[in-house]
Regions:
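Charged alpha-helical initiation segments
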Residues: 1-40, 49-60
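Long, charged low-complexity segments
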Residues: 1-4, 50, 54-177
Length: 177
């Protein structure tokens, strides 16, 4: 079955998020595993909304770091503001408060400009050896997600992004049927 690009990204983001939720609950799973899934969920969810706004497919493929750019669009959407019971200034501040955590998660992607830590591939340490994601704790991010209002708020926003049909409609993501 083929889908419009925005819907395809959204469906994959939902699947990644479901897997994230399952793995995150398993106490002996390395945090790198579920952080990788969370990063991919944020990326694909943002790309769904950006694709619905007619962003070019090739441009979307150029970067893994798109959720912050997308999140900054939320205060400009009346339906989103209304659903969160916030005015534009409040939502803008709310998103701004999440940006450090969003950036930390988006930096988990390996690439030319990222020499570690990443949630996916080993990276070199200062002594010439390597760290491996499955043995690295990612304590700052894990603590923020598990124990802070920022973490809870980011996951609440992400749940809306993935599941709130009114948000989908507001951004032009329509059902493929």
């Amino acid at each position: 079955m083929t889908l419009p690009l925005a819907h395809a990204f959204l469906e994959q983001a939902k699947t990644d998020y479901s897997t994230f939720e399952i793995i995150r609950k398993i106490s002996d799973q390395p945090s790198s595993q579920w952080l990788h899934l969370l990063q991919m969920t944020l990326e694909k969810a943002a790309k769904a909304y950006l694709a619905a706004g007619n962003e070019n497919y090739d441009r979307l493929r150029e970067s893994h770091r798109v959720f912050r750019r997308f999140a900054r669009k939320l205060p400009h959407n009346k339906r989103v503001r209304d659903s969160l019971n916030m005015n534009a200034a409040e939502l803008k501040q709310h998103i701004k408060n999440l940006e450090t955590l969003i950036d930390d998660i988006e930096r988990l992607v390996p690439g030319r400009d990222n020499y570690g830590p990443t949630a996916e591939y080993p990276w070199r340490n200062s002594q010439g050896g390597f760290y491996t994601p499955c043995q690295y704790g990612f304590e700052d991010i894990v603590s923020a997600l598990n124990n802070s209002a920022r973490g809870r708020n980011l996951l609440r926003i992400l749940n809306r992004v993935l599941s709130d049909e009114s948000w989908h409609i507001a951004f032009g993501i329509t059902s493929p049927n």
